[in-house]
Amino acid sequence: MASPGPNLPTVKRALILLAALAISASAADWPEFMGPTRDQVSAETGLADTLPAGGPPLVWEKAVGKGYSAPSVRDGKLVVHHRMAREEIVEACDAKTGLTLWKYAYPSDYRDPFGYNNGPRCTPLLTADHCYTLGAEGVLLCLDLVTGKKVWQRDTAKDFDVPEAFFGAGSSPILEGGLLIVQVGAQLNSGVVAFDAATGKTVWENVGEKTWNGVPMTGWPGSRIVEWNRNDPRFEKQASYCTPVAATIHGQRHILVCTRQGLVSLDPKTGAANFSFWFRSRQDATVTAMTPVVHGDLILLSNCYYKTGSVLLRVKAGGKSVEEVWRGLQLEVHWTRPVLEKGMLYAFTGRNEPDARFRCVEFATGDVKWDRDEGWPNGGHAKLEAGEKAPDVFGRGAAILADGKLIVLGEAGLLGLFRPNPERIEELGRWQVPQMRYPCWAAPVLADRRLYLRDEHWVVCYDLGR
């Protein structure tokens, strides 16, 4: 149910100055997963060129519940989806102060089968009027962005017979032409579903047995083909942790979804399939979590498990098939999608904390331009005891791009600034964010020169302006 604030966060003195300032002309929203253009890039300027020893000015900090989803910001509102006790909570705050505007809570019994936290994984999607969220158990919500009142709700797990996913629902919804596109992961042919964004009614559903049965298992040894097993939902789980991508290729609009089995292109209006491409690890208990990188007619897929590596695909004229451009182990990305800048990918590669590396890779060729070890020392796991100092590495960091700089958050809360440079690593500064602790798996969010960071306990706001 929706409820008003006040739930006051700790507000620092910097807030007093901030409140007196009008929103600058360079103000920009970050209304959904991967930002305003869905590519981790912001058009904002006037950002700091380095990080001072004491860090940028703290604007506010706010205690929140469990979850891995990033907050979203639109029209002065920040929305964070988190879990406290046995409730998932969608909470809207004033982006400048952190003060709660409204909350909507609903029951959740989700327990992660692998021992990770039980909070939501998907980032809220904000429009001018509405807030869309997808919870860990597959509850799809549309709320009024002003009041927090429920507009409609769907229980995707029940409505579409979804097998239990490895880590809960983790593919953020996107909006395309009035349709909310969701990777539901259902049997038999409801891996991807389009909902009417205004009403929540199902418009189309596709992807499953008819997509994959009989197709070549590209990248696997021998000449194997897919034999879809209706009786083994464990093997035929469809949901991955990649968010759908909407792109125009050769003049045709595509919804590109990397499911657990591989890449599928769908017509956004009808859900009809254009092409599919098998891409997954040979081990059962694995998923693909990196959202594809799309540029022109090229699509990059990557997976960190068991030498699956990466493949760059080119969509052929007509939009009905693809061909491989390169394939290799240059990138084995877990979930932190690379940033593409001037033909170069800036990426954190590696499955676990000890084998994390920061790399610059040429998008078109796969050539590695530079590489730096960012793994946790001594092969240790990243979970730290209370008071223990975090290692001075980024691990599997998450990056965004703004004002000609990469803003990186490491998975134990190390904040870094880098200048994109294919010739060498050009680090502008680093600082350990005091509130952030492992696991910091939500990417940074930038709106109106304010940087929003989230871990399992806090959302913090820092002034990143010059």
Identify what each model region corresponds to:
Residues 18-27:
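Hydrophobic h-region of N-terminal signal peptides that target proteins for export
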Residues 27-466:
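Noncatalytic, solvent-exposed loop/strand surfaces
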